[in-house]
Amino acid sequence: MSALTTSQLATSATGFGIADRSAPSSLLRHGFQGLKPRSPAGGDASSLSVTTSARATPKQQRSVQRGSRRFPSVVVYATGAGMNVVFVGAEMAPWSKTGGLGDVLGGLPPAMAANGHRVMVISPRYDQYKDAWDTSVVAEIKVADRYERVRFFHCYKRGVDRVFIDHPSFLEKVWGKTGEKIYGPDTGVDYKDNQMRFSLLCQEAPRILNLNNNPYFKGTYGEDVVFVCNDWHTGPLPSYLKNNYQPNGIYRNAKVAFCIHNISYQGRFAFEDYPELNLSERFKSSFDFIDGYDTPVEGRKINWMKAGILESDRVLTVSPYYAEELISGIARGCELDNIMRLTGITGIVNGMDVSEWDPSKDKYITTKYDATTAIEAKALNKEALQAEAGLPVDRKVPLIAFIGRLEEQKGPDVMAAAIPELMQENVQIVLLGTGKKKFEKLLKSMEEKYPGKVRAVVKFNAPLAHLIMAGADVLAVPSRFEPCGLIQLQGMRYGTPCACASTGGLVDTVIEGKTGFHMGRLSVDCKVVEPSDVQKVATTLKRAIKIVGTPAYNEMVRNCMNQDLSWKGPAKNWENVLLGLGVAGSEPGVEGEEIAPLAKENVAAP
């Protein structure tokens, strides 16, 4: 691709009144508010923000004086000088989501904006989002040997600029419900032009300098920004900054943080495709990768995630224990473990949307409650759940729930294999999820085999998911691996203890005997169901249902609900990591509260 010149980018950082200041380089290592997590064995976990052999923090002598900023009066935010932060990702809830990536880009940015930072999120426009307007800004992006016209759409929600990249390759493929059509026509099937699609995203994101002032957009973010890239879809972005912009004096002081949400998806493509990225030869070694697996291309490939890790200024992931797993070896680092041991990686546990998931206000549950009224209310919600699921209504029967995407990572096959042993107990099981057809059939077969004790719902059903959280006694999370996990946070928010595998963020967030039960680590081999794993799941769930209804169980319910599971703590940890990059003008935020996240003006309308 031809390099950009300053004249091609109409705006610059001058509108911010930038002077120099010294950026702090310390990393706040503070955990989540509430119960202190510990390992399944009972020892204290270090914290929920931990760094493993991280790069040295850059020391830059810079300072900033930022002019005043104005936000709509419907939401009140803290007014610190803050940072200019631009998140880039393939998903952004609620407009688009297949899993945790969408949740993070939906929830973390508003939490950072509440602390006074100016925050933008850039993601593809997969649908005709009715709350996003056409900015009329058009850019031509070179992909392979042709140019593509790309437009910007924008909306301002919860203090965050939401920018959507508009191109037919996004909009024409995903129509109506986005779901799993974002990456392919069906689960596990990728679009053949995904490399071109997400190259557009990576090249278009830095063009935010071209966005114009208007009543809904308060002007350029300038060049002194922190880009936060997320997963393989954004892996080439730091290379494009170095190749196309910085040699021409643009984004010279910008920094890039790269966040890994799931190491299993790396963006591996044929090595011969590298020229289509229009990057110079100097970046080829960062993409170059010898693949030990056989899909999608055998042997030598380009690896987008590898390039993102190597070319960024800081590498993060979504929980401290997952960070440790990623550098532990090939099995859990998926052949990039050696790279991450070189660069270092920081784990910060995710938060959750406590406005959407709030048992005291949830419109989908029969009886609303808080920590003081949870015991009786959950029993009433259990009866409503049993009736809704077509199971015998009896509040004294322990009820286990499984909610998740039906794919190997989440362990639906392991869960199904454990059900026959669980049927020896007086227990009911509700299974909810969609995904691979073979797993949908497997769960339905459990219902057919054990009518009156097992109910499987293999379709998207948000109201039922909320009722399950409120009515279940135990939430089963038998994940083979789990970078952070959201389901256990939602369960604990509703006072439902989790019986979970001891992996990733489940270790950081679920405390054995306090807020849940640990099964131990399960095998990451997705091709087989290990008998030992089935036994771990069955044994742990039987251990859990034995205490349902006891004073010890009631105490666990209260422990779960008395935690702060919001994005507030994680946002502060993210702030301190990004401040450590030393971007000119970056200052700590001032702790603030988002006053009206559910106000009409702030509710997304995808």
Curated annotation (Swiss-Prot):
Q: What class of enzyme is it?
A: transferase
User: Which molecular function terms from Gene Ontology are attached?
Assistant: alpha-1,4-glucan glucosyltransferase (UDP-glucose donor) activity
What InterPro entries does the annotation carry?
Glyco_trans_1 (IPR001296), GS/SS (IPR011835), Starch_synth_cat_dom (IPR013534)
Q: Where in the cell is it found?
A: Plastid, Chloroplast; Plastid, Amyloplast
Transit peptide: which range?
1-76
Gene3D superfamilies for the chain: Glycogen Phosphorylase B
The terms describing its cellular component in GO are: amyloplast; chloroplast
**GO BP terms, alphabetized:** starch biosynthetic process
Quick one: where is this thing mainly located? plastid
Q: What is its EC number?
A: 2.4.1.242
Residue ranges annotated as coiled coil are none
Q: Which residues bind ADP-alpha-D-glucose?
A: 97
* Region named Disordered: 29-67
Bias class Polar residues marks the residues at 46-66
Biological pathway: Glycan biosynthesis; starch biosynthesis
Which reaction(s) does the protein catalyse, per the Swiss-Prot or TrEMBL entry? an NDP-alpha-D-glucose + [(1->4)-alpha-D-glucosyl](n) = [(1->4)-alpha-D-glucosyl](n+1) + a ribonucleoside 5'-diphosphate + H(+)
Domain of life, per lineage: Eukaryota
Q: Which UniProt keywords apply?
A: Amyloplast, Chloroplast, Glycosyltransferase, Plastid, Starch biosynthesis, Transferase, Transit peptide
Q: What does this protein do?
A: Required for the synthesis of amylose in endosperm.
> Into which family does the record put it?
Belongs to the glycosyltransferase 1 family. Bacterial/plant glycogen synthase subfamily.
Q: What is the recorded name of this protein?
A: Granule-bound starch synthase 1, chloroplastic/amyloplastic
Name of the encoding gene:
WAXY
